[in-house]
Amino acid sequence: MEKQWWHGKIAYQIYPKSFFDTNGDGIGDLPGIIEKLDYLKDLGVDIVWLSPVYRSPLADQGYDISDYYDIDPRFGTMDDIDRLLAEAKKRDMYIVMDLVVNHCSDEHEWFKKACADPEGKYGQYFYLRKLRKAAELKTGTNSEAAGEVSESEKDGAAGDVKESEKDGAAGESFGTALTAAVENRTADGGEAFAVCSPDGYVLPCNWRSYFGGPVWEKLPGHEDWFYLHVFHKKQPDLNWENPGVREEIYTMINWWLDRGLAGFRIDAIINIKKALPFHNYAPDRADGLCTIGRMLQEASGVGEFLGEMRDRTFKPHQAFTVGEVFNEKAEELPAFIGDNGYFSSMFDFSETVWGNSHAGWHKNKSIMPDDYRQCLFDTQKKVSDIGFISNIIENHDEPRGVSRYIPPQDMQSMDEQMRVTAKKALATVYFFVKGLPWIYQGQEIGMENYPLQSIDEVDDIASLDAWNVMLRQGVSEEDALRAIERNGRDNARTPFQWSAAANAGFTAGSPWLQVNPNYTKINLEQQAADPSSVFCYYKKLIALRKNPQYCQTLIYGSFDPYLEDRSRVISYLRRSSGQTILVLSNYGKETRILPLPAPVKKILLDNCEGNDLSVTNSTVTLSGYRTLVLEL
C-alpha cells in the first residue's frame, strides 16, 4: 500500500441543513460552515465532507439534484462555496462534496426534456419504457411488455458488489395496489408471474425501490411511458450505459475539481449498473416485490464505469475520494481501494447493516457489543494492507452511534458520569483501528437519538415508509414508533447542539427539524469548558493519532485482535517496528481484571483519567466501560 497525504488526517462530515444557521431561516447554510471552520480546526479536523448543497427540490434532502453547477439558495451562493474553499485552504483544510450521479432530480433539465420527447436524445439519459397493459398481453415476457430496449442497455449488467437493502421508504409510487397479473412472465427460480401498475400496465421488473414501492413510475405527461427510480420517485436513475450521460458527468466532476474541491464522497455508486434486460426475482414481501439488493447481487460490470470515471476525473486531479459501497467481497477490495483503486477509500458499513431485516424495521436486531467487535475486526482482517478503509460510527443515514453501539439497557441504567465514560469507550475502540477516522457532526459531543413522541415529528421519507410498512403488517403504532426511534435517519439530522440557548444555538428562527430536548445537558459550550467531557476527549484522541511519536504505529502499524474470546471486551494491538500500542476496553458495566500481553511502559490515554488504576506487570483492573490506550 502506497502512503498517501490523507492517511494521517482526520475527516468530518457536515450535514449543512442542521449545522449552523446564520440568517435565521431555520436552515443551516454555507456562511454558517465558514463561521465554524475555526472550531473544526481547533478540534483537529483536516478533511470536511459536505452533504449536498447543490440546487435541489430537497425531496430527499439534496440527494435529488436539479442543477449540478449551482448552489441551492437555501444554503447560499456560488460565491459562498468559493469563499468556503478559500477559507479552508488558509487553514490547511480540504473540502469534499457529495457526488450524486446514480440519479438526478425529476426537476433537472435533462429529465424535463426527456418528458417532452421520450424517444429523443434525453430520453436515452434515463431508463424509459413504453409499457402495455396486461389485458393486451396473452403470452410473452416482461421485456416484451416493456417494449424495445436501447442498444446501450442490451449488454448491461450491474456490479458484483451487493449493496445492502436499506429498509424503509416512502411507498408513494404504486403503494399496495400491485397485483400478480399476467401468466407466462419469467421469475427468478420460481413460479412465473408479473406485477402491474394500479391501472394495469405490466412493469418491466418487480424490484422494490429503497424508498418503497416499485422502481417504475409513470412519466409525467404520458399514459404508457414509465421511468426507473431505485430511490425516490423524484430521483430518476441516469442511464450510465449511455456514453453521452457519462461525458456529462465527467465534465461536471472536472469542473468542480478545477474550482478547488479536494474530492468527493461518492453516493450510492454501485447502483449505476443494472442487471439488464430487466427481469423479476422471487418476491420477499407480500407486495410482490423484491429488494434492489437482489438485483445488485447478480449484476456485474460496474468496474468498467468506475475505472473510466477514475481515469477521466479523479486521477488527473489527484483527488481524494471515498465510496459508499455496501457488502463488497474480499476479492474485490484491491479493485476498489488498492493502489490503483476506483476510490481512495470507502466506508466500512459492516456494523451499520448488521441485523437489518428485509421484512421491516421492527424486525431489525439490535447489535450487541460482541457483534460490533466482530464487525470491526472482520473488516480489519479483510482489508489488511490492501488499502485504507474509512471508519465511522454514524452518518446522516444512520441513528446516533452512542444510541446504537452502547446497549440501550446500559445507557438507561447508568448515571451520567458512566454514560460519558461509555461514550468515550466507543470513541476509542473505533478511532484507533487501521484506516481513516471520520467524525459526524455532533458525534464529538455525544449527541443521542431523538426521543420520539409522535409520528408527526418525523421528517425522513424512509422512516415514514417504514411506518406504513409496519402498520400494514399489524405492528402497533407504539412499537412502530419505537422502531423508528431506533433506526430513523432523523436521529442524525437534528440540529447541532452548540449551546444551552434557545434552539441549542443553532438558529435564531424556527429550526427546520426539532432540536433534541437534551440540548441543555449535551452541548458544545458546556463541554468545551469541561476537561472531562466527551468533546475534550475527542480532542485527545485526535492529538494522540497525530502525535509524531506514535502516529506511524497508529496509522500504518499492523492490527492484531486481543482477547477476542472475552465477551464484552474490545481490545487490539497496533504494532510497528520497535513499538506496540494496546487498546483495551472493558465494554460493559461490571469491573473486570484483564490480562496484559506485556508490561505497560506508558498510559497514553485513559477515559477515566484521575481515577485510581490498578496495574501489574500481567494484569489491569478496569471498572465499567473503562478504556485504555497503552504503550507496551
Give the ranges of each region predicted by the language model.
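Active-site and adjacent substrate-binding regions of carbohydrate-active enzymes
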Residues: 1-155, 159-632
